[in-house]
């Protein structure tokens, strides 16, 4: 009886907590993974953030580049709620796009690089893309995809100096680095007014009919980024080899997780077994993720490519479970593989 009375009194007193305790700037901030980059820039400005071939950037440099690119997007008319598409390999540009595009309030739409022109055309039309950032290597497929696009799309070329792109024509009116340098590094970027504001638009592939659009919001991306770090027991200052395509579910949301952990991102343009083992050795890689086919390539790589690992490396794989023999081979090479499954 005493317990019931206390319970009733608690219900009556609940109203006290509904008075003058509304959300305000002092007690509430919408969750957004953009806050990870801002924090890491402030606390670990000189930590190496991204390495790719001849290029490397610290976290303060990455932050500055993202802010400038966001500013440049606003200057050409991109605003909150607009879609900015990107079709690129795992180079620094697509990592930066996960911050620069939402910094102007827009939504990043990372397009699968293996799609045909008709499907890409559908995605550009359906998403209402205002801007398309694209690696020059995709000139042919993008040129065809743009033939029947009804609305004006501003094209920004990624001219990767570390790749031999001389045979590929320029597609757009802007080049990524030049465009970035038109932006203001002191630009006051836009934090989401509401954590349910869209941050990303992904499209399914391999489904019946046309691709299906899937919207991520700032809150969801924030929670996915933090949850992944806990589920995989990821430490600070890890060395992450980016083998998962960043167009695939936003690279499993690790562009946001890695800034939260002030890790080092080692970019990989193409899946190449010899290159993967070289990068693992050179940068003391601690973590990477990959589809089962990537694990199969590593497990069955020529012996001359399989460098002896200096430490156990954490590997995350998703999708169809790899055969048990692949798990065994990877374990014998020094990889600790964790299999997961998730939805777009």
Region roles according to the model:
Residues 46-91, 95-99, 116-121, 172-177:
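Conserved AMP-binding/adenylate-forming core of the ANL superfamily
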């Amino acid at each position: 009886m005493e317990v019931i009375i206390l319970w009733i009194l608690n219900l009556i007193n609940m109203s006290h907590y509904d008075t003058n305790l509304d959300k305000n700037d002092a007690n509430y901030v919408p969750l957004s993974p953009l806050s990870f980059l801002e924090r890491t820039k402030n606390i670990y400005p000189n930590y190496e953030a991204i390495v790719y071939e001849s290029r490397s950037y610290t976290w303060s440099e990455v932050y500055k580049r993202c802010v400038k690119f966001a500013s440049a997007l606003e200057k050409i008319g991109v605003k909150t709620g607009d879609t900015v598409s990107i079709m690129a390999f795992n180079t620094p540009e697509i990592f930066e796009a996960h911050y620069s595009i939402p910094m102007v309030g827009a939504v990043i739409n990372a397009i699968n690089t293996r799609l045909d022109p008709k499907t890409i055309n559908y995605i550009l039309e359906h998403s209402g893309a205002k801007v398309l950032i694209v690696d020059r290597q995709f000139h042919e497929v993008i040129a065809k995809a743009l033939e029947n696009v009804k609305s004006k799309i501003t094209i920004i070329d990624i001219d990767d100096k570390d790749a031999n792109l001389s045979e590929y024509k320029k597609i757009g009116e802007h080049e990524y680095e030049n465009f970035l340098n038109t932006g203001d590094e002191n630009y006051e970027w836009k934090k989401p007014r509401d954590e349910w504001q869209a941050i990303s638009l992904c499209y399914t592939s391999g489904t019946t009919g046309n691709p299906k659009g899937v919207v991520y919001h700032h809150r969801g991306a924030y929670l996915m980024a933090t949850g992944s770090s806990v589920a995989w027991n990821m430490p600070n200052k890890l060395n992450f080899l980016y083998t998962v395509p960043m167009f695939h579910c936003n690279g499993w949301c690790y562009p946001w997780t890695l800034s939260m952990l002030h890790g080092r991102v080692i970019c990989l343009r193409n899946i190449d077994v010899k290159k993967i083992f070289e990068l693992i050795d050179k940068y003391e890689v601690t973590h990477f993720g990959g589809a089962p086919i990537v694990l199969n390539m590593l497990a069955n790589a020529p012996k001359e490519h399989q460098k002896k690992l200096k430490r156990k490396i954490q590997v995350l794989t998703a999708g169809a479970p790899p055969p048990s023999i692949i798990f065994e081979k990877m374990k014998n090479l020094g990889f600790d593989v964790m299999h997961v499954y998730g939805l777009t």
